[in-house]
């Protein structure tokens, strides 16, 4: 078997600031467009327009199950007070530059949805590209894979599912990260062996 080792960037997430309460709505029966306007107004000086569009799509998909087409065609849809308040809270947290993935509790990776929390780093686009490259170049060939600093487990789970017969190990020093990764493995029915290890102190000769 060919061996593949992933070594992740090691960092400690910053503590998130407690969020403020917004007062963008005065009525309980408001159309979706007013929530979209709130996002643009509160976040326009912090994020570029394209990123705000991405936030809007993710928020309405998560809270309402709406597709981008739904958002475009049904902006006059009346949303419940509960939905409006949730959007207010999400917008406030975004204004504090908290990642949208941590706010919503998930991230998409290689066509699958993974649970995510501040105890695990959010995978970068280049990480997804590298994972797809490994899959493409080793299609049908089982590998021995070590995902070091696995975080959410998205790489380990994706490779275990995409390269059948591979032996996949996932290491992390963080108990919280391993719990998230194991949850994702169960969610996707992927066979991955998890270990709590400090890769900076581990003796590779063992």
Feature map (PLM): residue ranges:
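SAM-dependent Rossmann-like transferase core, predominantly class I methyltransferases
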Residues: 85-163, 168-183, 194-203
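N-terminal auxiliary segments of SAM/dcSAM-dependent transferases
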Residues: 28-104
């Amino acid at each position: 078997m060919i061996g593949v080792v992933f070594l992740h960037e090691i960092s400690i997430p910053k503590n998130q600031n407690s969020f403020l309460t917004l007062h963008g709505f005065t009525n309980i029966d408001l159309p979706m467009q007013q929530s979209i306007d709130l996002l643009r107004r509160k976040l326009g000086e912090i994020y570029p327009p394209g990123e705000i569009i991405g936030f809007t799509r993710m928020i309405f998909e998560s809270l309402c199950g709406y597709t981008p087409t739904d958002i475009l065609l049904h902006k006059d849809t009346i949303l419940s007070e509960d939905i409006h308040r949730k959007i207010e809270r999400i917008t406030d947290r975004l204004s504090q530059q908290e990642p949208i993935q941590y706010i919503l509790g998930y991230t998409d990776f290689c066509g699958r949805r993974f649970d995510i929390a501040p105890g695990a780093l959010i995978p970068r686009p280049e990480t997804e590209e590298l994972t797809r490259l490994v899959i493409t170049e080793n299609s049908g060939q089982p590998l021995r894979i070590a995902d070091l600093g696995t975080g959410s487990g998205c790489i380990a789970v994706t490779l275990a599912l995409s390269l059948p017969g591979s032996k996949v190990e996932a290491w992390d020093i963080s108990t919280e990260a391993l719990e998230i990764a194991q949850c994702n493995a169960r969610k996707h029915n992927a066979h991955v062996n998890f270990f709590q290890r400090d890769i900076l102190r581990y003796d590779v000769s063992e």
